[in-house]
Amino acid sequence: MKYYIFTYGCQMNKNDSEMVSGILKSSGWEEAKNVVDSDLVVINTCSVRLHAEERAIGTISALKKLGKKVVVMGCMSEVRGNEIMSRFPHVQAVLGPSYEAHILDVLNGERRILVGDEKVDFEKYSSANRKEKHSVYVSIMKGCDDFCTYCIVPFTRGRVQSRDPESILEEVRVCVDNGAVEITLLGQNVNDYGKDLSGWDFVSLVERVATIDGVRRIRFMSPHPANFKKDDITRLANLPQVAPYYHLPLQSGDDEILRRMNRKYTTGEFAELVGFIRESVPNVAIGTDLIVGFPGESDEHFQNTFKFLEKMQFDVVYMAIYSPRPGTAAARQETSFVPAEVAKARYDELLRLQEKISYSINQRYVGTLQEVLIDREDKTTGKFIGRTPTNKTVVFTSIRHVSPGEFVDVRINEAKSWVLYGEAAD
């Protein structure tokens, strides 16, 4: 029997799919190379934006004519699970994020829907079927307690549940034994880790991970700026394994919009935090997220965001146009929605600005020697692709063949907004 998994959305979803793949493989299933050859199709869904839901619905609908057994899981299961079961009789089961480890229990018998905020079986992540062995993602928690007004995650993934630290450390050890050199710790707001445990916090966990032999780089995504303390940053800066790249979701550069979003910080506080990170971590790169067109965003609000983006000089910015999510506070502000064409124009303007900023920042890398972790080889061009400690993508040539998981010194000879180019130094 063969299975195939479609995954939509964030890195946490990709990690969940690897966990489910591991469960299926350990029970005798074989992963199919394509959906046509499969007997079971698992669709891991995302509800952060409407577009992600529409893509998943399109996939579910298209599978009807193939006659496959279908299981739908992920965030969309929590908010549209009943609708999916009623609209699509070919769907065998719907599993919310807390129930994904129960995949084997729902493959036969009556159609089932398992949703709700239950205790997550984190132990199942230890048997994840990872696509990459050298760079792995490890889930340290589920859920969120912050309730930003635009965000559906607390409603789909529930409240914060911290994973047992010894379970996390053991998974990291197993990954290292299997070839991992880079570990990325995953959580909705990773610095909330440990709030439901005794004697643990996020930085304590990172400090323990750093003691494991073979861990060369540690990354994490993402901390909430409101809860990221200077003492945390100082402790992290003292760990040589922690990569000098910090992703801090800003969401808006206007204080009034931040207040309406329930982000719990001001632009001044955010700028102070970034300044402290830049002082504490040599050659650090900073990334962020922005939402454009939040309900009630005026031209003045937008211009404040534009100016703040200019001021902060982020290395990379992931932007999205606001998408109303059912059940969230912001979605009830229909009378103040920003017209789609206005939001798109603002998005384009910010993107053009950030392209210039990123291009300017990346020019500083030209002529430098960077330690690059190899991710893959481009079979078409014969070039290799990897990442610097600051998470810059590097495309380079090498006289000798190099493999994923190797660290190579690369001389950078060209830089664009999103990619560096170079040659291996050896």
From Swiss-Prot:
Binding residue positions for [4Fe-4S] cluster 2: C144, C148, C151
GO cellular component term of the entry, any: cytosol
Highest rank taxon of the organism: Bacteria
Cofactor, how bound (note): Binds 2 [4Fe-4S] clusters. One cluster is coordinated with 3 cysteines and an exchangeable S-adenosyl-L-methionine.
The reaction(s) this protein catalyses: N(6)-dimethylallyladenosine(37) in tRNA + (sulfur carrier)-SH + AH2 + 2 S-adenosyl-L-methionine = 2-methylsulfanyl-N(6)-dimethylallyladenosine(37) in tRNA + (sulfur carrier)-H + 5'-deoxyadenosine + L-methionine + A + S-adenosyl-L-homocysteine + 2 H(+)
EC number(s) per entry: 2.8.4.3
Keyword Cytoplasm: yes
Compartments, as annotated in UniProt: Cytoplasm
Membrane-crossing residue ranges in chain numbering: none
Cofactor needs: [4Fe-4S] cluster
Keywords: 4Fe-4S, Cytoplasm, Iron, Iron-sulfur, Metal-binding, S-adenosyl-L-methionine, Transferase, tRNA processing
Entry's Gene Ontology molecular function annotations: 4 iron, 4 sulfur cluster binding; metal ion binding; N6-isopentenyladenosine methylthiotransferase activity
Chain ranges of the Radical SAM core domain: 130-360
Function field: Catalyzes the methylthiolation of N6-(dimethylallyl)adenosine (i(6)A), leading to the formation of 2-methylthio-N6-(dimethylallyl)adenosine (ms(2)i(6)A) at position 37 in tRNAs that read codons beginning with uridine.
HAMAP family listed in its UniProt record: tRNA_metthiotr_MiaB
Name under which the protein is recorded: tRNA-2-methylthio-N(6)-dimethylallyladenosine synthase
Source species: Coprothermobacter proteolyticus (strain ATCC 35245 / DSM 5265 / OCM 4 / BT)
